[in-house]
Amino acid sequence: MTARLKLRQLETALNEVEVFETPKVLLEQYPTRPHIAACVLHTIETSYGGLDGRIVADLGCGTGVLAVGARLLGARAVVGFDIDPEAIETAKSNLDDFGFCNEDTEGFCDLVLCDVTQTYTTLFDKECEIGRTEDYSRFSGVFDTVVMNPPFGTKHNRGLGLFLLFCTIIGKNS
């Protein structure tokens, strides 16, 4: 399979993605470096055909480097999930800067402010952290590919397992 961009082109583009000004250590906001993001995404596309024309979720999207990269490699739709409203704003800005949020742009981008570690219950309770009712069951089995750089539990001993659980709920082939 061939990717829309060569690995070096993807990495160069991802170097333009704005990162956290002040990462929140308690949320384990360690950035995914452009080189790592490019290698991971390029491998997903060239080895598995997992991005071009696909619907992709980015769990713990942070500033959106994986979401931007997925769109650059041809993802039809990308939905980023994060607990931090500032990260969501930065991710939106990054997606806007690359022209992925325009109505004229082919494809779709969205960002969901939520705590993925609480989503196992909120899938059924329909409660969202941003003060509106959200039906998370609509995401069940929707995504072709799920990408993430989750918290690994170095500050709070929780997160990774719940991120993986959410992957099994929202992914088509989990």
Model segments located where?
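S-adenosyl-L-methionine
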Residues: 1-57, 68, 72, 90-141
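Conserved glycine-centered beta->alpha loop in an early N-terminal alpha/beta scaffold
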Residues: 60
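Conserved SAM/SAH-binding loop
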Residues: 63
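Conserved SAM-binding motif I beta-strand of class I
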Residues: 77-82
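Conserved short alpha-helix immediately C-terminal to the canonical SAM/SAH-binding motif I
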Residues: 86-87
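A short SAM/SAH-binding and catalytic strip from SAM-dependent methyltransferases
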Residues: 144-157
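A short glycine-rich, Lys/Arg-flanked "PGG" loop and its adjoining helix->strand segment in the class I
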Residues: 162-173
